[in-house]
Regions:
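Extended, charge-rich alpha-helical interface modules
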Residues: 1-78
Length: 78
């Protein structure tokens, strides 16, 4: 999901509850999206749901990346 080394991710997970919650939320969205994408034909309401899930998933990933950037910046300034 993220292009960070696992030790750094573990460090951030231990120190940032929001990151952990976002990571879990991102996984739930991924599972729900995959379930929708397995269907051959999506009714209009499922198409809307798919787009909503994709946007939420991207927003979660963007926020997680921002947390990682802030954490690295904080580490380098101390």
């Amino acid at each position: 999901m993220l292009n960070e080394d696992s030790e750094w991710l573990d460090h951030v997970r231990k120190g940032n509850r929001e990151f952990v919650e976002l990571e879990q939320h991102h996984r739930r969205l991924e599972r729900e999206l995959n379930t929708l994408l397995k269907r051959r034909i999506l009714p209009a309401d499922d198409e809307v749901r798919k787009k909503t899930l994709q946007k939420e998933k991207l927003a979660a990933k963007d926020r997680m990346n921002e947390i990682l950037r802030q954490s690295k910046l904080a580490e380098t300034t101390h």
